[in-house]
């Protein structure tokens, strides 16, 4: 009871003393410590910026909730899905608490052993991948959470690729060791085979499933138990006798894996010397920071086991802001390597301020902009510049975020994550002070949307609310795209999946009081050519007075399959036949004409327009002439080309009980899926397949019915590839019917 009274008081005013078990080793602690953590006197060594990311339902939010509790940031723990009527702190949106999923990245900060930790909890659904991209772009390190039962899953691979793209060092935490069928050894094996990671256990479990009692620390060679009602008392003991041999073997394996990627430990290993605990810890840190080794930790967040050692590992093995190299680009036309400028992580005002807006949110007091500070100092009341728009803005209010609660601060320094109010900007914008307004941070990678639906308000009187909501959502989320189809007179919204668009339709109703009607999902088909086609096109227009004249000669080429979503323009002209000032006009004409293909009306992609020669007229040639010439050249080339329709292919992962294996395989085959792999544990099997997105609609209902509700699946975009002849014929006929070039079949309504 005494302990409960202490923890219940956390977060409300000064505390006389906080016990060592909560992360402070018997030091005086005050809640206001959190308010001091932005000050310049806090060195970089005392700061960590980390993200927690994983596949859906691996336990990221539950883990974050435990971290906040053990570090004294929250007084009581709550469960995901609001089982206790409250819901997790980090799931602040009502929809998140209802569904038990994380939709937006929530930012918080806490303290562990005198080190300030900024944490971003990210979604696991592939539909919300942009949130993970944004988080990893601005973090220095991450914790990748795996489920001990599911192991490496679809989204785990996506997150791993994203971490590689942004060069983020990370630890792995295998969660849910208390679940039936948990197998951490299998999860480790999958990390090595599927993700190609040089990974090894730093801990091994004492028991599994219902017998999971604690963990063995292989570095310090001791057993760790978690006592007390909430696992808050960490107790160290000797390794149980029956596990000593296994612990020795795993420790040797750990040393070998680290020695393979760290030179200093490798030398000790070759000399057959036994490394000391500090030697091993330093080697693991060096190898983790260089991304050549992944340490693997174990536990069960729900059962309050293994969280405190993971926090210690974050401090020991993940980098502080001064150990990460962040670059800004000079805003020049040729942004090559030489134009990259290294940011200085010093926590003072000796260098100009540079920050990146990585997330936007509509808060209670206007737009909230999350900013990662890379260099210099940002003060409340100071003036900063948006390098994209060139506009200057005043920082009226500077806050630190704890999920949806905020705390005002006077200044932040390099390495801090903060939020600004009332600043008009877009995600990925760079802010600087006047001294260096030609700098910008590298922009965040934004994947293309793969699915579209028509959306309109149920009530025509709600059009104003609808447009307000759409404007806000597109500003906050770059993967949520909107355009107006002039032919069907419909507003088309595009996103990363059915769930993504469904969530926005629900948010429109909840947050703007505007119920929406959504149409049938439409897949983002594309058209491309199968072989190079030459063109030689002249645009001439004489109507008295100044006319128009532009001639272009070149070739239209298909791109490689991995570039099917791109459009490229190549200027290979010599001399002044096509004046250089008109080349961008030719490119504009080409890109404009790619908006609609001749075969099925879908966009053209996977093309390279190579401009080789042409001609101009001294008087009649102008920009519009060459725009029309570019458009005409593309149409001329397409008229003699062999076109094909390409479609998005999804990587699908299905998990279901073994008795339904036949039905699941048959279902995937019916949807023209190509099975790429399979594995199984206990009574469940996992099927991996590549399936056209067009064939995946309604699959969740089919899977539920054929597995008695026990099967589940996830999918993510993989690539574009040519669709089947039958699908192509169907799409072409549908387009011809819609445009009146083909009579509509009897009994079939126009689409």
From Swiss-Prot:
One GO MF term attached to the UniProt entry: translation elongation factor activity
Please list the tissues where expression of this protein has been recorded.
Detected in all tissues with the highest level in liver, thymus and brain.
Identify this protein by name: Elongation factor G, mitochondrial
Q: Which cysteines are joined by disulfide bonds?
A: none
Q: Tell where it localizes.
A: Mitochondrion
Q: Family assignment? A: Belongs to the TRAFAC class translation factor GTPase superfamily. Classic translation factor GTPase family. EF-G/EF-2 subfamily.
What's its job?
Mitochondrial GTPase that catalyzes the GTP-dependent ribosomal translocation step during translation elongation. During this step, the ribosome changes from the pre-translocational (PRE) to the post-translocational (POST) state as the newly formed A-site-bound peptidyl-tRNA and P-site-bound deacylated tRNA move to the P and E sites, respectively. Catalyzes the coordinated movement of the two tRNA molecules, the mRNA and conformational changes in the ribosome. Does not mediate the disassembly of ribosomes from messenger RNA at the termination of mitochondrial protein biosynthesis.
N6-acetyllysine modified-residue sites? 176
Query: Which EC main class describes this enzyme?
Result: hydrolase
What is this organism's lineage?
A: Eukaryota, Metazoa, Chordata, Craniata, Vertebrata
Q: Which InterPro entries does this entry report, sorted A to Z? A: EFG_II (IPR041095), EFG_III (IPR009022), EFG_III/V (IPR035647), EFG_IV (IPR047872), EFG_V (IPR035649), EFG_V-like (IPR000640), EFTu-like_2 (IPR004161), G_TR_CS (IPR031157)
Q: In which pathway does it act?
A: Protein biosynthesis; polypeptide chain elongation
Gene name, per UniProt, is Gfm1
């Amino acid at each position: 009871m005494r302990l409960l009274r202490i923890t219940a008081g956390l977060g409300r005013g000064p505390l006389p003393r906080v016990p060592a078990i909560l992360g402070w080793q018997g030091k005086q602690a005050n809640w206001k410590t959190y308010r001091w953590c932005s000050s310049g006197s806090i060195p970089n060594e005392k700061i960590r910026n980390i993200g927690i990311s994983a596949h859906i339902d691996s336990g990221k939010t539950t883990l974050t909730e435990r971290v906040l509790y053990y570090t004294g940031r929250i007084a009581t723990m709550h469960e995901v899905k609001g089982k206790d009527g409250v819901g997790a702190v980090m799931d602040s949106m009502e929809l998140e608490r209802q569904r038990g999923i994380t939709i937006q990245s929530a930012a918080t900060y806490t303290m562990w052993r005198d080190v300030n930790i900024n944490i971003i909890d990210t979604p696991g659904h592939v539909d919300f991948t942009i949130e993970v991209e944004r988080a990893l772009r601005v973090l220095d390190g991450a914790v990748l959470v795996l489920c001990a039962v599911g192991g490496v899953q679809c989204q785990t691979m996506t997150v791993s690729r994203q971490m590689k793209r942004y060069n983020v060092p990370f630890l792995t935490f295998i969660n849910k060791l208390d679940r039936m069928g948990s197998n951490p050894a299998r999860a480790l094996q999958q990390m090595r085979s599927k993700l190609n990671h040089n990974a090894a256990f730093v801990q091994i479990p004492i028991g599994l499933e219902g017998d999971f009692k604690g963990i063995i620390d292989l570095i310090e060679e001791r057993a760790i138990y978690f006592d007390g009602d909430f696992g808050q008392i960490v107790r160290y003991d000797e390794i149980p006798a029956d596990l000593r041999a296994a612990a020795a073997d795993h420790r040797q394996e750990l040393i070998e894996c680290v020695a393979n990627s760290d030179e200093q430990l490798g030398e000790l290993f070759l000399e057959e010397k036994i490394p000391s605990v500090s030697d091993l810890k330093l080697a693991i840190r060096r190898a983790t920071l260089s991304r050549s080794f992944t340490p693997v930790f174990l536990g069960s967040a729900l059962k309050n086991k293994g969280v405190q050692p993971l926090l210690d590992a974050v401090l020991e093995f993940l980098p502080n802001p001064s150990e990460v190299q962040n670059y800004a680009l000079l805003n020049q036309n040729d942004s090559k390597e030489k134009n990259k400028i290294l940011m200085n992580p010093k926590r003072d005002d000796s260098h100009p301020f540079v920050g990146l807006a990585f997330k936007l949110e509509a808060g209670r007091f206007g737009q909230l902009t999350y900013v990662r500070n890379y260099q210099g100092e940002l003060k409340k009341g100071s003036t900063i510049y948006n390098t994209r728009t060139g506009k200057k803005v005043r920082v009226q209010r500077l806050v630190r975020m704890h999920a949806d609660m905020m705390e005002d601060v006077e200044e932040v320094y390099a390495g801090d994550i903060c939020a600004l109010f009332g600043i008009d900007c877009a995600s990925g914008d760079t802010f600087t002070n006047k001294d260096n307004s030609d700098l910008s941070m590298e922009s965040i990678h934004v994947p293309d949307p793969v699915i579209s639906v028509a959306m309109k308000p149920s009530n025509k009187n709600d059009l104003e609310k609808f447009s307000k909501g759409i404007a806000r959502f597109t500003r906050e989320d770059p993967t949520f795209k909107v355009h107006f189809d002039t032919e069907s007179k419909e507003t088309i919204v595009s996103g990363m999946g059915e769930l993504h668009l469904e969530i926005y339709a629900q948010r429109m109703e909840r947050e703007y009081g505007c119920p929406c009607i959504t149409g049938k999902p439409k897949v983002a088909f594309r058209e491309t050519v199968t072989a190079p086609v030459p063109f030689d096109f002249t645009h001439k227009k004489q109507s008295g007075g100044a006319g128009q004249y532009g001639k272009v000669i070149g070739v239209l080429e298909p791109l490689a399959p991995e570039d099917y979503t791109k459009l490229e323009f190549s200027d290979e002209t010599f001399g002044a036949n096509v004046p250089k000032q008109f080349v961008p006009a030719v490119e504009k004409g080409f890109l404009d004409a790619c908006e609609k293909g001749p075969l099925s009306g879908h966009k053209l992609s996977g093309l390279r327009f190579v401009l080789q020669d042409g001609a101009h007229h001294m008087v009649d040639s102008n920009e519009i002439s060459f725009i029309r010439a570019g458009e005409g050249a593309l149409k001329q080339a397409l008229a003699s080309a062999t076109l094909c329709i390409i479609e998005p292919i999804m990587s699908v992962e299905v998990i279901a009980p073994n008795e339904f294996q036949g039905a699941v395989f048959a279902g995937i085959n019916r949807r023209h899926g190509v099975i790429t792999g399979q594995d199984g544990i206990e009574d469940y099997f996992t099927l991996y397949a590549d399936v056209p997105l067009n064939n995946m609609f309604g699959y969740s209902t089919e899977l539920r019915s054929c597995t008695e509700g026990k099967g589940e699946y996830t999918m993510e975009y993989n690539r574009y590839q040519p669709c089947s002849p039958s699908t192509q014929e169907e799409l072409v006929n549908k387009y011809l019917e819609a445009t009146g070039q083909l009579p509509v079949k009897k009994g079939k309504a126009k689409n």
